[in-house]
Amino acid sequence: MSNLVFDIEADGLTPTKIHCIVAMDVDTKDVFTFDNTQLDEGYNMLQTATKLIGHNIIGYDIPVVERLGHIDLSDKKIVDTLVLSRLFKPTREGNHGLEGWGYRLGFKKGDYGEQEQAWEHYTPEMLEYCKRDVVLNHKVYNALKHESKGFTPT
């Protein structure tokens, strides 16, 4: 069992298909990519994980994967770095999104998706963008773990 940082790319905010899945093992730093022909392997990896980590995975990625992949991830420990970012510093300079974190950590998110209709069909560039998001999110996860050392709920 493993702890995975993961991300998906799909065809919009109310998706009808997932284009790709990328996951990183938190301990080994191994990165696993699954394009649109390998999604079942990606679903299997997510199902075998102990903990799933990602940015807005509670609000987007997990519900989309469960609905379109026909899998159940409800038994997983979930760490949503967007939720933690807002919890630890509600008035964080910049914003809580991955793009803002990328600027703060000196690891820019990338600009894929700014072109019109970028999310309609799978492209290899989309997979690379997803991979970069996962690497950035791993950095965010580590930064938030460091921040949490001084966090005391009131």
Language-model regions: role of each:
Residues 116, 120-154:
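Mixed-charge, glycine-rich, non-catalytic linkers/tails in nucleic-acid processing enzymes
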